């Protein structure tokens, strides 16, 4: 979800949900990858077939292969990459209103653009040797682009912050 402001006014608010799959196949020392957001079974079957055919026509690389089974992770450490907080659009708008007012405080400022974006992801890795692990991650990003003008020139600059946890955004 993202909210965008321009010159202290709400410009747009977007939400999108994406679901996709990525498939990598190995044949000997050959490897290829393919991805799709069409998760219908018949498409997945076609996707796998295409990936295998592509792999057959890919040059060998001595470093391409699945890891030995004894090297596979047994546990995945929690790296604290996920914050399940969901910030309401009203809160994003309030944050951006304060940001835009602060950014426009100098009379030389002629244009401002600010945005607040919230992303959530779920990653799963599985292979034919029985490995299947995953993790969730989140991202909260605030950014601002400011244009200043005086008698002789115009200058543009930006600032942003991106954190896994909402509480870490200043």
Label every PLM stretch briefly:
Residues 1-170:
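Active-site bordering "gate/hinge" segments
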């Amino acid at each position: 979800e993202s909210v965008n402001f321009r010159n202290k006014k709400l410009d747009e608010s977007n939400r999108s949900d994406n679901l996709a799959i990525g498939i990598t196949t190995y044949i000997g020392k050959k490897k290829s990858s393919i991805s799709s957001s069409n998760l219908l079974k018949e498409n997945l079957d076609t996707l796998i077939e295409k990936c295998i055919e592509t792999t057959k026509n890919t040059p060998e690389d001595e470093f391409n292969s699945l890891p030995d089974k004894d090297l596979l992770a047994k546990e995945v450490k929690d790296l604290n990459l996920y914050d399940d907080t969901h910030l309401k659009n009203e809160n994003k708008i309030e944050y951006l209103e304060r940001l835009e007012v602060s950014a426009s405080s100098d009379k030389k400022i002629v244009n401002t653009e600010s945005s607040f974006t919230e992303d959530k992801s779920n990653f799963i890795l599985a292979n034919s040797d029985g490995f299947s692990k995953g993790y969730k991650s989140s991202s909260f990003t605030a950014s601002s682009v400011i244009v200043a003008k005086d008698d002789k020139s115009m200058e543009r600059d930006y600032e942003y912050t991106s954190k896994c946890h909402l509480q870490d955004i200043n």
